[in-house]
C-alpha cells in the first residue's frame, strides 16, 4: 500500500470493522445483515499472510467440498468499478456454477467475466489454486495485468509463469501463490513433474479456447487434472469456437464444457456496446502482367505434376485447380498404399516428385494471393540452396521453362531481393525515386495503397474541420493483415514511401526460419505499446496480431488475403469497432481466393446457428457444482479499488523503461524519438531515468556518507617497503579488511556476470588465511615462505655482472613454494587491464613513478656493463636494472621494491591463472621500463627472445615481453648461446606460468612428511658453480609468466631455459670454454643463484672458484636447505616451467638427468624431450648435443666446451635429494629422462628414478604428484652418482597419504663411475609426452647391483608401472659409446612411486642378485640390454626366472639378444605417460614386456637403447594390448592366467607350447585353455600374440557384442592400442586383471614343461597360498585388459578371504600375491588416489599428466581387494552388494569397496519410483499420468539425457513408436541413442508402441518392412529386450511391471529423486561425467557428502555409491584423473578455464 491509500474496499472494512463486528456478533448481533456479509467478504479478501487460515471464521468453517469457505461462499461479488453490462453479469453467474464456453466477439469483455469468476473462486477456496491459461507469453502478461486491475487480487498472490520461468522457481511459486497466469505447456510440464498440486486447482480459465483441438496442450491439461480430481471449474473463452461444428464439438469435449454462453455480433445484448463494423469486400482482377507470369508458371507445374498423374499417384484433374493440400493428401495415400504398378520404381523418386510439386504449388498460391515478388523471393530461397531443397533445385534447374521464368523474375526484382531479405524498411532514396522504382507485384497492392492513402486523407480533412486541427490525426490507426512475412515486408516498404503521413511498422511472430528474423516477445510488446500510444499509425501484421493482443482502437483494418477459417477472419475484424465505428476491408484476388472467402463466411454462419440452437453438440454431463449443497451464493455488487499493478516479472517491460529495441537495427527506425535513440550512447539510462537517479539516488557531499578508503596495510616480512604513511582524511570511512572475511573465502553465486579473476585471486588469499588461522603449531605457509623472503634474495649482488639473479632467485624460490602446488593459496594477480598505478599501490610500492621514468634509468645506465645489457633481454633488466648498482639511491630503492613485488607477483602468477590473458599492470610497468631502456639507448642487441616473441609464439601477446614495436630493435643477437639461453628461459618461463598449482587440500601433511624425509636423508652440500651467464632471463620473473602453450615445440631457440639452469645447478660445472657461452657465467653466481633458487637451495656449497659473489646467494640458503629443499626443488621449478613438456624429444645424445627441468626446459625442441606430443619432432640437430641445453649455458647450441664435465657430487646429491624428499634413497632406478640439465659433463650415473619421479606420477599416481616417485638410488651411491631431483611439486604433492618409506634398497655403490661426456646426450630423456613416443630407458652403464635386496622393498606399484612401461628395444637407437646410460629403472621407480603409500616386502622375490649393467662403452645394443628370455633357451616359459622384455612386439625389428641383467626397473614412466596419456592410438606392447618383467624369482633389469625415436617410443605397451579375453579362469580354464608368470620368452618358437602333454586329462574347456595358452605372447603369458598393427581399440571393441560371452572368452581380437586409451574410450568393455606369474611355481613335469593348472590344483594351490598369506609377496602382478562381457550370467561369489591385491578390473588375481600383503590396506590406496584428484584441477603440467596416469593405473591395477578367483566371481560380489542382477556379469571387477553397499542407498521409500525424461511430457503425457494416477508409482520427471524411462539402477527403457522403427530415416539416431544407453545401464529395454490414432481416424495395420525386422533383430542380438505396446496406458503397465521386477532383484530406485541447494550443483557435476546416468548421479549425490569425497573415493566406493558396476566406476575414476592439458583448449576457453578451474578447485 503506497502512501496510506487503501488498496481495496474489503481491506478497509477488514481493518475498521473487523473487531467491532466480531464483538457485535458475540453480543447482540446488532449489525446489519448486509454489514455482516460485507465484513465476511472483507475478512476473506483481507490479504492475510496465511490465506489458508480464515481470520474471520463467520458462520461456519470451510465446508467439506474441497476447502470451500462457507463464510465467503455466502455471496459472490460482482465489481461495479466498471459499467455493468447485463450480458457480462449473466455470463459470470453461469460460469460460477458450471463449466462454460464463453463466446463473445473481440473487445466485448471476455476477460472481465473471467476476472470475476477467478476472483470469486479465489475467495471461496482459500487454499485453492486459480489458473488462467493463455497460448502466448504476451497474452499471459496482458491478461494478468487486466485481471489485477479489474478485480484487485493482491499482487503477492499472483504469479506469471511462462517458458522463461525456471522449474525450481515455479516449484516455489506453486507453493506460495494462489492465482497463476501461465501457458498451457508450462502447466503440462508441471503436472507431469508433480510440481503443480493438481488436487488444489479449483478454477481453470482457458483463453483462445478454440485451440483446444486434438492433442493440444489445453486438452492435456484438462485430461491430466481430471485424473486427480473432478472438482474444478472450467471457463473457456473464445471469440470463435471453431471453424466448423465438428471442431466446436471437439472443443466442448476436450474442455469438459457443460454449457455455452454465446453472443454473436448480431445479438441485441451486445449491440449497445459494440460499434458498427463496416465490412467491405473488394475483388481485384489479376491483370495482364500477372496473368502472363501465372500462365508460364502453370506450364512448369504441368511438367512436374504430370509425372505424378502418369504414375497414377495423383488424381487426373486440371493442374491449375490442384492445391498444395490435395497433393499432400495424395502423398499420404501413396505412402500408406503404394501402387502395385510402381513396384519397380524407386520410391524415393516418387517422393521427390511429390515434394517438388508441393513446393511449386506453394509458390503458385503465393503468386495468386501475394504477387510476383513473394513468388520470386520464395524461388530464390530454393535456387540459392538456403531452403535446403537440393533435389527440387536440381530438377527446376534442368527445366527450361522454369529457368526462363526465373530469369524474368530476377531481372524484374534484382535490386529488391536483397532489400527484402535484410528487412530494411527504408532506403536512402527520395520518395519520388521510391515511387518510381517500387514494383507492384500484385494488383492488390495498388488497391491497398489507394485505400490507406485515402483513409489518411479523409481523416486529415476531418481533423482540419475540427477545432483540434492536426491534434487528432495521430489518433487514427490502420492495421493491415497478411499471412506471409515477405508480403508484410513488401507492404511496409510500399507504405513507407508516404512517410511521415504514414508511419508504418511491421509486426511478426518469433523467428523460426534460418533467414528471416522474427520479433521477440519484448519486441512485440514494444511494438504494440508504441502503436497503441500513437508512435506508429499503421501496423502491418501477420496472423500473430489477430488474437488476443490489446492493440487499442483501430479505425481501419485491411485483410490483404482471405482465410478459409472463419475464426481468423472474426479475430481480425475484432481488432476494430471497439470504441468507435470501424471499417474492415477485405481485398481479394479474383478466382480461388474469392471462393475461399465466401466459403468461410458460410461456415461461420452455420456454426453460430448450431451453437445457439444447441441441437448438434454433446455437452459434458458431470460438471461439478463446486459449491456445497445448501449454499447458494448471493450476488453482491461491490466497488473494488485495485492496487496499482506492478509487473513483478522481469519478462515484462516496465512502463517508462526504454526497450532494448532501441539497439535493434532498423526495427524502429521510422519512428524513433531522437532523445530516446541517443540515450544509450553513454549510459544505460535514459535522460529521464538519469534525472531520477540523480535526484533520488546519487550520493552528494551533504548526505554525510564518507568516502570509503582502504586501511593502511603492511607485510610483516617486508617492513622496509612501506616507510611512509599518509595522514588519514577525516571525511573518509576506513573500511575493515576483516569485518567481512567470513564471506570472502568462497565465491558467491553470480548472475549474468561472473566473478573477476582478481576476485578469485582474493578469494584464494582469504581461503589461505582461513586455513592458516586454523593451523596449530608451526604455520605451514610461513615455513614455505621463510626461505623465500630473505634479504639476500631481494637485494641483488651489486656486482654488475650479476644483474639477473635477484628476480629469478626470488621468483623461482617463491615459485616452488607450496602455494604453487595449492592453487587455492595463490594471491591474486592484478588484472591485465589495470593501470600501473593500481598494481603498485596494491603491492605497496610507495613510489610508482620511478619505474616509469626514463631519467631514473638513465642515472643508472652507466653502471650497467655492456655485456650484461647485451646478454640480458631488456625485459630481464626491467626488474633488476636498478638493483644491480651498489649505491642505493631512493630511486633504486623504489625500483627494488617494485622488483621484489614483481617477483612475488611472478610467483603468484606462475601457474594457471597467469596465462596470457592475465597480464598484469606490473607487466605494463615492465614494458615501460623496457621503453625507457630503449629510450636511454641501452644496448638491446642481445635480446634473444625477439624471434620468440614475434614469430614463434603468436599466442604470447607480448606477455612479459616488449610489445612487438620493441621487438625489431632486438633482432640482433650477440651470441647464439646467449640467445638460446634466453629463449630457453623464456620458454620455460612461459610454461611455468601456464598452469595452475594443485589445491591446498592435498598438502595437509606434507611438511611433516618432508621434514621426516629430510631427517631420513640429510642432504650433503654439493658445491656447484652454475653457468648462469647465459641465463639472465632466469632473473626476471616477469618472463616466467609466459604461457607454456606459447612455446613452439620446434623452436630451436628455446632450448635453454630456466629449468635448464636449475638443472645445471645440480652439477658442478666447469667454466664454459667459450666466452659467449660463459657470458659472465663464472662471474655470475646469481645465475647460479637463480638455479639455486630453482633447486630450492639444494645446499650447494658454492664452488666459488671464480665467483666470490656466489657466496652471497649460497649463504643462509644451505642453513635452510634441509628444511626447505622439499618445497623449492629444481624439479618443481621445472615443473612450472615446462608444464606440458613431459614429452621430451629424444636425442640419442641427451643424457637424462633431472628430467623435468631439462625436458620441460627444452620445450623448444629439446633433445631432452623424447617426444613432445604431436608437435614434437626429432631434434633437428640429430645426434648433435642439443641435449646440452641441460648443461645450461654453453651447451645450449651444442657449443658446450668439449672439456666440460659435470661434477659427480651435485647430480648424485640431486638424486639423493629426491630420495630424501620421498625417501626413495634405497631404491634402485635408472634415470630414463633428462633431469633438466645436460649431464654431458657429469661423469656420474644419472638416475632415471627422477624421471620416474617426474613422470611416473603421471601414470601411477592419481594425483599429478611426483612424490610417489621412488628413487632407487642408494644414498651412498647417490652421493657419488648424479643427484636426481624430484620436482617438489610432484614429490610434495603426492606425498600425502603415501607411505614414502618404501625405498628400494640399492645395493650397489658403483653408480659413480659412469662418465657421460658432455657431448653425448643419453638416449633416454624421460617419459615422453602424452602423445609422443616414450624413449627407451637406457640403463646406467658399468654398474653392478647385487642382490634381490634391491627390490625387496619395491612397492607393488613398481610392478604396475613396470609392466605398463617397459620400453621396447628400438633397433634404430644408437648411443654414443660414451653416452650416459640414463634409463635407470624408471619403470620400477614409476611403479614404486605409484604405490602411493603401500610398501610390499618383496623379500622372497628371488630377484636376480647379479644385476649387471653393460659397460659404458658398449654399443647401443649391448648397452641397452633388453632382458628377455632367449627364444630357444628354455622351452618351459613358465620356469624362467628371468624377466624378459619382449621388445620384439613393440618394435618392428627383432630385438638383439643381450645379457641378462638385474632389474633396474626399466623406464616405466616415459612409456606410460606417453602411451596412456595423449596418444590413444599408440601401441603399447613394449611396455607389456616390461609388465611381464619383474616376474617370479629373477626380476631382470631391462635396458633399452638410449636413442628412441618418437615413432617407436610409444610402442612399449603394444604387447600389453593383447589382452586376454577371459572373464573367469574357473569358467574357462584355470590355467589361463596363473601360468602366465613364466611365459616370458619372446621366442616365436614358443608360439605353440609342445611341453603340455597332459592335455588329454583336461576337459574341453581346459583343452581350449591349452590352445589359448599356446598362442599367448611369450613376453606376457596372459597376452595373446596378435598382429602387430596399430589400430584404435575402439575399432575392435565396438564390434564386440556386450553379451557375447563366448566371444569375449575366446577373443584374440584384442587392441594393441594403449591400455589407458582403451580404458577411456571403451572401458566399459574391458576388464583388467592382476595376474600372478608365479602360480605354477614349482609345479612342472620332469620334462620341464609347464604343468597346466586344473581347477582342483588351482584350488589346492590357493589353499596353500592362503596359509602363507602373511608371507611377503615375491610376484609381480600384471594387468590384463579383458574384454568386458556384460551378459547376464551371475556366478557364485567367491568367499575366499585374505588381503588381495586388487586388480580394479575384475579378472584373474594371484592368490599368493593377493594374500601376501597383509600390511597393505586399501586406505592408503584411497588416500593416494584422492590426493591426486585434488591436485588435478589445480595443475595441468604435462609432466604431471604422466604421473597422474601412473597413479590412476596403479589404483586401478594394483590395490588390495577381496580375493576372488575370477572376474565373474568378483563381479558377482560387486553385483550383490550393489544389488544388481545377473546381467552385470563382467561389467564390474573385484573392488575392495564393492562389498560395502551404502546403507543410505538401501534406505529409501518402498514405493516404486520411475524416472521419466522431460521430453516424454509432450509425447507420453498419458504414460506419465497413468503411472502416477492409475498405478500409484512415484514419477520424477527430469532431464535424463538418454533414455525415456529409468526403472531401476540398472535398467533404462526407451519408448519408440512403431513408425520410427518402420522407417529407416531415423535409424542412425535410434542406434546412437541405444548405444548411449548401453554405455550407462546394464540392461536396456525398448518398448515399441503403436502410433496414436487421431480422433476420427481408423486404425490401420502397418506393414512390416524389412528394415523393421532387421532393427528388431539387431536389438535382440545386442541384448536389448524388446516389448510391444498398443497404447500409452499399456506402456505404463509394462513400465510398472519392469519396475516391480527390478525391485524384486534389489535394483529399485531407492534414493530421493529430488535434490536442492548444493546437492543440485553436485548433481550437475556428476551428470557432466561421461557414461554417468541421471540415477547414478543421484545416487552419488546422496551417498557422497561432497564432490570432493566422491573424487577422492576408490573405484569400489564409487561403484557402491553410484550403484553402478565396478567397471563403470573405474571409468569414472579414470576420467576424474585424466591428465588434462589446458593448452589443448581453444584460446577463448584456455584463459577462462585456467583461471576458474584452478581457483575453484
From Swiss-Prot:
Motif range (DEAH box): 207-210
Main location: nucleus
Free-text description of this protein's post-translational modifications in UniProt: Phosphorylated; hyperphosphorylated in response to genotoxic stress.
Source organism of the structure: Gallus gallus (Chicken)
Segments of skewed composition (Pro residues): 48-60
Location of the Helicase ATP-binding domain: 91-259
Location(s), subcellular: Nucleus
Keyword DNA repair belongs to the record: yes
EC code(s) of this entry: 3.6.4.13
Gene3D superfamilies per UniProt: 3.40.50.10130, 5' to 3' exonuclease, C-terminal subdomain, hef helicase domain, P-loop containing nucleotide triphosphate hydrolases
Name of this protein: Fanconi anemia group M protein
Keyword vocabulary terms for this entry: ATP-binding, DNA damage, DNA repair, DNA-binding, Helicase, Hydrolase, Nucleotide-binding, Nucleus, Phosphoprotein
Function: DNA-dependent ATPase component of the Fanconi anemia (FA) core complex. Required for the normal activation of the FA pathway, leading to monoubiquitination of the FANCI-FANCD2 complex in response to DNA damage, cellular resistance to DNA cross-linking drugs, and prevention of chromosomal breakage. In complex with CENPS and CENPX, binds double-stranded DNA (dsDNA), fork-structured DNA (fsDNA) and Holliday junction substrates. Its ATP-dependent DNA branch migration activity can process branched DNA structures such as a movable replication fork.
GO molecular function, one term: RNA helicase activity
Bias-annotated ranges (Polar residues): 802-814, 1375-1389, 1685-1697
Amino acid composition bias (Low complexity), ranges on this chain: 1170-1181
GO cellular component, as recorded: cytoplasm; nucleus
Amino acid at each position: 500500500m503506497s502512501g496510506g491509500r487503501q488498496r481495496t474496499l474489503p481491506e478497509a472494512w477488514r481493518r475498521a470493522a473487523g473487531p467491532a463486528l466480531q464483538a457485535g456478533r458475540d453480543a447482540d448481533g446488532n449489525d446489519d445483515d448486509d454489514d455482516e456479509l460485507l465484513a465476511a467478504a472483507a475478512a476473506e479478501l483481507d490479504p492475510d499472510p496465511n490465506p489458508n487460515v480464515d481470520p474471520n471464521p463467520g458462520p461456519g468453517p470451510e465446508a467439506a467440498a474441497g476447502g470451500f469457505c462457507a463464510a465467503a461462499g455466502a455471496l459472490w461479488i460482482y465489481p461495479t468499478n466498471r459499467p455493468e453490462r447485463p450480458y457480462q453479469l449473466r455470463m459470470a453467474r453461469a460460469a460460477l456454477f458450471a463449466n462454460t464456453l464463453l463466446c463473445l466477439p473481440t473487445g466485448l469483455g471476455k476477460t472481465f467475466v473471467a476476472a470475476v469468476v477467478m476472483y470469486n473462486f479465489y475467495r471461496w477456496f482459500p487454499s485453492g489454486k486459480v489458473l488462467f491459461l493463455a497460448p502466448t507469453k504476451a497474452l499471459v502478461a496482458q491478461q494478468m495485468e487486466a485481471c489485477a486491475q479489474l478485480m484487485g487480487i493482491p499482487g503477492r498472490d499472483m504469479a506469471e509463469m511462462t517458458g522463461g520461468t525456471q522449474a525450481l522457481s515455479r516449484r516455489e511459486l506453486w507453493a506460495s501463490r494462489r492465482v497463476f497466469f501461465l501457458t498451457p505447456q508450462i502447466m503440462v510440464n508441471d503436472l507431469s513433474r508433480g510440481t503443480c498440486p493438481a488436487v488444489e486447482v479449483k478454477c481453470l480459465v482457458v483463453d483462445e479456447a478454440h485451440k483446444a483441438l486434438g492433442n493440444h496442450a489445453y486438452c492435456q491439461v484438462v485430461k491430466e487434472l481430471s485424473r486427480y480430481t473432478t472438482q474444478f471449474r472450467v471457463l473457456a473463452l473464445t471469440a470463435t469456437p471453431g471453424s466448423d461444428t465438428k471442431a466446436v464439438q471437439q472443443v466442448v469435449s476436450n474442455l469438459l464444457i457443460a454449457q455455452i454462453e454465446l453472443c454473436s455480433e448480431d445479438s441485441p445484448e451486445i449491440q449497445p456496446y459494440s460499434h458498427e463494423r463496416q465490412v467491405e469486400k473488394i475483388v481485384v482482377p489479376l491483370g495482364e502482367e500477372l496473368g502472363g507470369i501465372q500462365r508460364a508458371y502453370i506450364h512448369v507445374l504441368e511438367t512436374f505434376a504430370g509425372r505424378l498423374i502418369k504414375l497414377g499417384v495423383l488424381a487426373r484433374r486440371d493442374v491449375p485447380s490442384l492445391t498444395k493440400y490435395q497433393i499432400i493428401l495424395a502423398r499420404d495415400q501413396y505412402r500408406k498404399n503404394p501402387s502395385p504398378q510402381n513396384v519397380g520404381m524407386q520410391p524415393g523418386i516418387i517422393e521427390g516428385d511429390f515434394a517438388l510439386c508441393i513446393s511449386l504449388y506453394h509458390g503458385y498460391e503465393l503468386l495468386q494471393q501475394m504477387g510476383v515478388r513473394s513468388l520470386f523471393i520464395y524461388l530464390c530461397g530454393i535456387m540459392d540452396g538456403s531452403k535446403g531443397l537440393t533435389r527440387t533445385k536440381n530438377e527446376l534447374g534442368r527445366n527450361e521453362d522454369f529457368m526462363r521464368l526465373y530469369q524474368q523474375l530476377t531481372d524484374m526484382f534484382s535490386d529488391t531481393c536483397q532489400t527484402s531479405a535484410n528487412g530494411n524498411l527504408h532506403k536512402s532514396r527520395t520518395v519520388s525515386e521510391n515511387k518510381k522504382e517500387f514494383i507492384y507485384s500484385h494488383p492488390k497492392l495498388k488497391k491497398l495503397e489507394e485505400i490507406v492513402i485515402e483513409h489518411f486523407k479523409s481523416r486529415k480533412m476531418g481533423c482540419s474541420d475540427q477545432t483540434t486541427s492536426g491534434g487528432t490525426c495521430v489518433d487514427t490507426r490502420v492495421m493491415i493483415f497478411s499471412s506471409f512475412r515477405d508480403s508484410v515486408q513488401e507492404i511496409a516498404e510500399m507504405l513507407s514511401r508516404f512517410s511521415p503521413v504514414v508511419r508504418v511498422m511491421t509486426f511478426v511472430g518469433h523467428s523460426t526460419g534460418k533467414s528471416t528474423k522474427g520479433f521477440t516477445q519484448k519486441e512485440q510488446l514494444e511494438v504494440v505499446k508504441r502503436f497503441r500510444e500513437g508512435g506508429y499509425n499503421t501496423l502491418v501484421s501477420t496472423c500473430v496480431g489477430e488474437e488476443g493482443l490489446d492493440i487499442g482502437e483501430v479505425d481501419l483494418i485491411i485483410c490483404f488475403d482471405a482465410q478459409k477459417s472463419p475464426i481468423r477472419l472474426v479475430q481480425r475484424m475484432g481488432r476494430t469497432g471497439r470504441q468507435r465505428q470501424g471499417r474492415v476491408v477485405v481485398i481479394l484476388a479474383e478466382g480461388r481466393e474469392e471462393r475461399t472467402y465466401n466459403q468461410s463466411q458460410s461456415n461461420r454462419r452455420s456454426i453460430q446457428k448450431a451453437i445457439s440452437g444447441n441441437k448438434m453438440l454433446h455437452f459434458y454431463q458431470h460438471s461439478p457444482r463446486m459449491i456445497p449443497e445448501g449454499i447458494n451464493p448471493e450476488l453482491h455488487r461491490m466497488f473494488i479499488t485495485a492496487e496499482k499493478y506492478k509487473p513483478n516479472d522481469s519478462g515484462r517491460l516496465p512502463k517508462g523503461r526504454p526497450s532494448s529495441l532501441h539497439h535493434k537495427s532498423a526495427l524502429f527506425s521510422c519512428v524513433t524519438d531522437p532523445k530516446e535513440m541517443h540515450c544509450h550512447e553513454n549510459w544505460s539510462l535514459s535522460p529521464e531515468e538519469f534525472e531520477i537517479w540523480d535526484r533520488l539516488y546519487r550520493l552528494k557531499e551533504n548526505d554525510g556518507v564518507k568516502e570509503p578508503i582502504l586501511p593502511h596495510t603492511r607485510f610483516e616480512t617486508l617492513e622496509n617497503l612501506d616507510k611512509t604513511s599518509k595522514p588519514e582524511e577525516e571525511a573518509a570511512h576506513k573500511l575493515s579488511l576483516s569485518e567481512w572475511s567470513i564471506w570472502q573465502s568462497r565465491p558467491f553465486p553470480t548472475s549474468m556476470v561472473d566473478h573477476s579473476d582478481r576476485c578469485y585471486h582474493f578469494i584464494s588469499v582469504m581461503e589461505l588465511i582461513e586455513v592458516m588461522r586454523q593451523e596449530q603449531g608451526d604455520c605451514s605457509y610461513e615455513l614455505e615462505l621463510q626461505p623465500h623472503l630473505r634479504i639476500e634474495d631481494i637485494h641483488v649482488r651489486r656486482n654488475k655482472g650479476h644483474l639477473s639473479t635477484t628476480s629469478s632467485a626470488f621468483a623461482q624460490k617463491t615459485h616452488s613454494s607450496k602455494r604453487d602446488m595449492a592453487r587455492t593459496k595463490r594471491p591474486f594477480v592484478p588484472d591485465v587491464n589495470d593501470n600501473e598505478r593500481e598494481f603498485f599501490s596494491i603491492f605497496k610500492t610507495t613510489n610508482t613513478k620511478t619505474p616509469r621514468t626514463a631519467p631514473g634509468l638513465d642515472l643508472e645506465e652507466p653502471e650497467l656493463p655492456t655485456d650484461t645489457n647485451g646478454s640480458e633481454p631488456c625485459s630481464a633488466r626491467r626488474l633488476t636494472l636498478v638493483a644491480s648498482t651498489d649505491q642505493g639511491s631512493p630511486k633504486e630503492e623504489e625500483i627494488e621494491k617494485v622488483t621484489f613485488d614483481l617477483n612475488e607477483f611472478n610467483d603468484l602468477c606462475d601457474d594457471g591463472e597467469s596465462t596470457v590473458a592475465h597480464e598484469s599492470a606490473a607487466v605494463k610497468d615492465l614494458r615501460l621500463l623496457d621503453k625507457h631502456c630503449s629510450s636511454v639507448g641501452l644496448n638491446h642487441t642481445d635480446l634473444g627472445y625477439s624471434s620468440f616473441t614475434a614469430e614463434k609464439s603468436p599466442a604470447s601477446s607480448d606477455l612479459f615481453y616488449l610489445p612487438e614495436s620493441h621487438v625489431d630493435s632486438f633482432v640482433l643477437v650477440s651470441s647464439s648461446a646467449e640467445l638460446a639461453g634466453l629463449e630457453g628461459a623464456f620458454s620455460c618461463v612461459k610454461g611455468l606460468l601456464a598452469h595452475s598449482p594443485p589445491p591446498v587440500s592435498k598438502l595437509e601433511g606434507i611438511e611433516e612428511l618432508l621434514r621426516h624425509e629430510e631427517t631420513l636423508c640429510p642432504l650433503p652440500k654439493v658445491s656447484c658453480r652454475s653457468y648462469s651467464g647465459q641465463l639472465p632471463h632466469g632473473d626476471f620473473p616477469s618472463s616466467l609468466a609466459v604461457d607454456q602453450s606459447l612455446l613452439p615445440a620446434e623452436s630451436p631457440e628455446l632450448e635453454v631455459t630456466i629449468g635448464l639452469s636449475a638443472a645445471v645447478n645440480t652439477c658442478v660445472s666447469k667454466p664454459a670454454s667459450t666466452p659467449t657461452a660463459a657470458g659472465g657465467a663464472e662471474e655470475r653466481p646469481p645465475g647460479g643463484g637463480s638455479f639455486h633458487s630453482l633447486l630450492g637451495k639444494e645446499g650447494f656449497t658454492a664452488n666459488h672458484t671464480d665467483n666470490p659473489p656466489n657466496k652471497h646467494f649460497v649463504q643462509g640458503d644451505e642453513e635452510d636447505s634441509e628444511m626447505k629443499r622439499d618445497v623449492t626443488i629444481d624439479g618443481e621449478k621445472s615443473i612450472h616451467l615446462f608444464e606440458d613438456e613431459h614429452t621430451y624429444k629424444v636425442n640419442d645424445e641427451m643424457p637424462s638427468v633431472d628430467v623435468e627441468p631439462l625436458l620441460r626446459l627444452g620445450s623448444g625442441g629439446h633433445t631432452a624431450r623424447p617426444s613432445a606430443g604431436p608437435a614434437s619432432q626429432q631434434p633437428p640437430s640429430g645426434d648433435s648435443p642439443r641435449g646440452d641445453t641441460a648443461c645450461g649455458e654453453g651447451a645450449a647450441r651444442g657449443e658446450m666446451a668439449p672439456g666440460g664435465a659435470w661434477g659427480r657430487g651435485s647430480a648424485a646429491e640431486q638424486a639423493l635429494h629426491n630420495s630424501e624428499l620421498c625417501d626413495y634413497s634405497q631404491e634402485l632406478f635408472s634415470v630414463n629422462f633428462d633431469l633438466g640439465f645436460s649431464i654431458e659433463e657429469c661423469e656420474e650415473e644419472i638416475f632415471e628414478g627422477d624421471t620416474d619421479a617426474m613422470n611416473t606420477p603421471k601414470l601411477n599416481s592419481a594425483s599429478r604428484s611426483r612424490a610417489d616417485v621412488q628413487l632407487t638410488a642408494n644414498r651412498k651411491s647417490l652421493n657419488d652418482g648424479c643427484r636426481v631431483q624430484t620436482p617438489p611439486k610432484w614429490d610434495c604433492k603426492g606425498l600425502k597419504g603415501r607411505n614414502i618409506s618404501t625405498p628400494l634398497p640399492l645395493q650397489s655403490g658403483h653408480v659413480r663411475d659412469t662418465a657421460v661426456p658432455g657431448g653425448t646426450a643419453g638416449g633416454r630423456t624421460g617419459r615422453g609426452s602424452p602423445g609422443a613416443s616414450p624413449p627407451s630407458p637406457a640403463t646406467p652403464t658399468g654398474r653392478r647391483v647385487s642382490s634381490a635386496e634391491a627390490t625387496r622393498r619395491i612397492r607393488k606399484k613398481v610392478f604396475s608401472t613396470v609392466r605398463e612401461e617397459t620400453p621396447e628395444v628400438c633397433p634404430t637407437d644408437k648411443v654414443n659409446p660414451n653416452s650416459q646410460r640414463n634409463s635407470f629403472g624408471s619403470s620400477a621407480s614409476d611403479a614404486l612411486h605409484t604405490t602411493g603409500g603401500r610398501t610390499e616386502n618383496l623379500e622372497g622375490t628371488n630377484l636376480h642378485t647379479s644385476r649387471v649393467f653393460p659397460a659404458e662403452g658398449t654399443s647401443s645394443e649391448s648397452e641397452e640390454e633388453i632382458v628377455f628370455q632367449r627364444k630357444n633357451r628354455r622351452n618351459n616359459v613358465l620356469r624362467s626366472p628371468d624377466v624378459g622384455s619382449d621388445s620384439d612386439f613393440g618394435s618392428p625389428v627383432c630385438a638383439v639378444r643381450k645379457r641378462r641383467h638385474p632389474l633396474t626397473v626399466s623406464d616405466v614412466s616415459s612409456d606410460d605417460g606417453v602411451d596412456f596419456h595423449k596418444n590413444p592410438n599408440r601401441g603399447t606392447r613394449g611396455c607389456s614386456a616390461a609388465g611381464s618383467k619383474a616376474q617370479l624369482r629373477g626380476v631382470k633389469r631391462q635396458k633399452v637403447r638410449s636413442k628412441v625415436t618418437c615413432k617407436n617410443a610409444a610402442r612399449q605397451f603394444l604387447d600389453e594390448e593383447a589382452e586376454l579375453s577371459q572373464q573367469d579362469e574357473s569358467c574357462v580354464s584355470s590355467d589361463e592366467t596363473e601360468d602366465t608368470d613364466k611365459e616370458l620368452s619372446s621366442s616365436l618358437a614358443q608360439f605353440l607350447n609342445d611341453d603340455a602333454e597332459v592335455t588329454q586329462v583336461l576337459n574341453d574347456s581346459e583343452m581350449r585353455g591349452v590352445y589359448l595358452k599356446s598362442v599367448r605372447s611369450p613376453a606376457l603369458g596372459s597376452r595373446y600374440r596378435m598382429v602387430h598393427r596399430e589400430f584404435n581399440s575402439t575399432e575392435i571393441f565396438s564390434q564386440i557384442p556386450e553379451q557375447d560371452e563366448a566371444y569375449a572368452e575366446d577373443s584374440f581380437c584384442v587392441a594393441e592400442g594403449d591400455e589407458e586409451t582403451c580404458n577411456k574410450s571403451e572401458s566399459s568393455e574391458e576388464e583388467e586383471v592382476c595376474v600372478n606369474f608365479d602360480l605354477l611355481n614349482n609345479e612342472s613335469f620332469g620334462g620341464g614343461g609347464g604343468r597346466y593348472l586344473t581347477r582342483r590344483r588351482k584350488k589346492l594351490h590357493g589353499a596353500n597360498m592362503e596359509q602363507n598369506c602373511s608371507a611377503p609377496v615375491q610376484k609381480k602382478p600384471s594387468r590384463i585388459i579383458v574384454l568386458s562381457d556384460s551378459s547376464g550370467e551371475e556366478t557364485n561369489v567367491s568367499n575366499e578371504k585374505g588381503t588381495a591385491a586388487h586388480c580394479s578390473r575384475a579378472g584373474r588375481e594371484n592368490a599368493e600375491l593377493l594374500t601376501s600383503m597383509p600390511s597393505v590396506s586399501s586406505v592408503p590406496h584411497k588416500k593416494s588416489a584422492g590426493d591426486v584428484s585434488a591436485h588435478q584441477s589445480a595443475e595441468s603440467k604435462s609432466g604431471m599428466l604422466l604421473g597422474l596416469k601412473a597413479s590412476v593405473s596403479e589404483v586401478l591395477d594394483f590395490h588390495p581387494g577381496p580375493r576372488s578367483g575370477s572376474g565373474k566371481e568378483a563381479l558377482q560380489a560387486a553385483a550383490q552388494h550393489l544389488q544388481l542382477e545377473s546381467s552385470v556379469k563382467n561389467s564390474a571387477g573385484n573392488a575392495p569397496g564393492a562389498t560395502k553397499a551404502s546403507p543410505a542407498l538401501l534406505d529409501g521409500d518402498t514405493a516404486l519410483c520411475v524416472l521419466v525424461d522431460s521430453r516424454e511430457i509432450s509425447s507420453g503425457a498419458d504414460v506419465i499420468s497413468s503411472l502416477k494416477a492409475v498405478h500409484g508409482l512415484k514419477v520424477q520427471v527430469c532431464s535424463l539425457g538418454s533414455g525415456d524411462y529409468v526403472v531401476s539402477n540398472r535398467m533404462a527403457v526407451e519408448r519408440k513408436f512403431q513408425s520410427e522403427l518402420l522407417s529407416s530415416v531415423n535409424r542412425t539416431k535410434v542406434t546412437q541413442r541405444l548405444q548411449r544407453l548401453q554405455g550407462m545401464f546394464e540392461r536396456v529395454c525398448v518398448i515399441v508402441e503403436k502410433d496414436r490414432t487421431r480422433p476420427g481416424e481408423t486404425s490401420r495395420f502397418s506393414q512390416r518392412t524389412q528394415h523393421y525386422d532387421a532393427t528388431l533383430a539387431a536389438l535382440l542380438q545386442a541384448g536389448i529386450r524388446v516389448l510391444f505396446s498398443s497404447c500409452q496406458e499399456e506402456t505404463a503397465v509394462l513400465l510398472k511391471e519392469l519396475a516391480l521386477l527390478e525391485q524384486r532383484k534389489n535394483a529399485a530406485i531407492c534414493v530421493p529423486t529430488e535434490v536442492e541447494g548444493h546437492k543440485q550443483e553436485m548433481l550437475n557435476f556428476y551428470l557432466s561425467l561421461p557414461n554417468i546416468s541421471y540415477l547414478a548421479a543421484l545416487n552419488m549425490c546422496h551417498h557422497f557428502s561432497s564432490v570432493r569425497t566422491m573424487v577422492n573415493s576408490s573405484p569400489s566406493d564409487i561403484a557402491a555409491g553410484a550403484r553402478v558396476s565396478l567397471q563403470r566406476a573405474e571409468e569414472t575414476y579414470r576420467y576424474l584423473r585424466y591428465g588434462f592439458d589446458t593448452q589443448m583448449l581453444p584460446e577463448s576457453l584456455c584463459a577462462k578455464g585456467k583461471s576458474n578451474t584452478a581457483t575453484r578447485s
